[in-house]
């Protein structure tokens, strides 16, 4: 599986997930500097946090 890995709206970077991590993840939240984005590979989809504005977990290449 290959997942996007950069903290920008448009993300050209991706990486192959290590063994045991078969989910692509994207989380967005608001800070005083504006919207923040986190993208990476995970083993389990995390819970929706109280400050999150969106949370995406998917299992296709570069789906996050």
Curated annotation (Swiss-Prot):
Is Membrane tagged as a keyword?
no
Record flagged with keyword Disulfide bond = yes
In alphabetical order, the GO MF annotations are: ion channel regulator activity; toxin activity
Please state where this protein is localized: Secreted
Keywords from the UniProt entry? Chloride channel impairing toxin, Disulfide bond, Ion channel impairing toxin, Neurotoxin, Secreted, Toxin
List the Pfam families. Answer: Toxin_cobra-type (PF21947)
- Domain of life per record: Eukaryota
Q: List the disulfide bonds.
A: 3-24, 6-11, 17-41, 45-57, 58-63
Of which family is this protein a member? Belongs to the three-finger toxin family. Ancestral subfamily.
Q: What does this protein do?
A: Allosteric modulator of the GABA(A) receptor (GABR), possibly increasing receptor affinity for the agonist, thus enhancing receptor opening and macroscopic desensitization. In vivo, intracerebroventricular injection into mice results in periods of reduced basal activity, followed by bursts of intense seizures and death.
Its protein name is Micrurotoxin 1
Lineage per the UniProt record: Eukaryota, Metazoa, Chordata, Craniata, Vertebrata
